[in-house]
């Protein structure tokens, strides 16, 4: 992550608080020696403002942005953002830049597993075009047969779910390996499914920064009021997001088939007679109707047709 350019240091925006930006930099070899002995951590954070010219030019700063920092005061742990690098992408709810993965977190019980709700969250994740992982929390609350039922169902949808329990640690090793392979993964899901509990479980294993900034932030048990990145491993980050129970959609009807992996896989090997086939009642449609979420597909397609009418 480290980069120097005319006395500017590269970092990643972890959080926005009021008019300030918390930026993590990896500068163990750059921080003045006397100060380095006090902090003892290479993942160092600065509380930053941004140059007014960025606003004049219409350059917003979002969590996940890579930025250049100047006017650094190592003692006060402050700096000024002078440049925002071009983004690879930006998801909008909530705004997070340079996302590589979407992690849908749903509970197996309390709140109960809702297949229709899970399907809609997965569809929303597929809209991003990014890699999608589904995590099933509270594994310890259900028996093996029920888990197998949900696992097989999600596999037919095109996913490999990761069931976990923060009570007994089941599945955490597999999830950790998956998180380690990500650059920036966003946790999404309904309220109350255990996203924040999962973050709190992982936090002891994460390199938590020390110094004045951490004391100013008074971080204790994590609860989600805004989006924030957490550094895991070396160059991997996860973003927790406020929970919401009903994803909003504005999908173009022609793009709806791309939200269903089980339909996409058919389209890779089959071709319909008409290029604009919506896989409903068109003649010579090559797509099978014999898949579980076909009714979900039809209903959602009609929903989007009505929306765009």
From Swiss-Prot:
Biological processes, Gene Ontology terms: ribosomal small subunit biogenesis
UniProt xrefs under PROSITE patterns: ENGC_GTPASE, G_CP
Cofactor: Zn(2+)
Tagged with keyword Transcription regulation: no
Binding, Zn(2+): 272, 277, 279, 285
Places the protein is found: Cytoplasm
EC class (word): hydrolase
Family annotation (SUPFAM superfamilies): Nucleic acid-binding proteins, P-loop containing nucleoside triphosphate hydrolases
Cofactor note: Binds 1 zinc ion per subunit.
Matching Pfam families: RsgA_GTPase
Gene Ontology molecular-function annotations: GTP binding; GTPase activity; metal ion binding; rRNA binding
GO cellular component term, pick one: cytoplasm
Domain CP-type G: 88-247
Documented EC number(s): 3.6.1.-
First-listed, main subcellular location of the protein, grouped into a coarse class: cytoplasm
Binding residues for GTP: 137-140, 189-197
Keywords: Cytoplasm, GTP-binding, Hydrolase, Metal-binding, Nucleotide-binding, Ribosome biogenesis, RNA-binding, rRNA-binding, Zinc
Claim: rRNA-binding is one of the keywords in the record: yes
Its biological purpose: One of several proteins that assist in the late maturation steps of the functional core of the 30S ribosomal subunit. Helps release RbfA from mature subunits. May play a role in the assembly of ribosomal proteins into the subunit. Circularly permuted GTPase that catalyzes slow GTP hydrolysis, GTPase activity is stimulated by the 30S ribosomal subunit.
Oligomer and partners: Monomer. Associates with 30S ribosomal subunit, binds 16S rRNA.
Cited HAMAP family: GTPase_RsgA
Record family assignment: Belongs to the TRAFAC class YlqF/YawG GTPase family. RsgA subfamily.
This protein's name: Small ribosomal subunit biogenesis GTPase RsgA
Organism, as annotated: Prochlorococcus marinus (strain SARG / CCMP1375 / SS120)
Gene (name only): rsgA
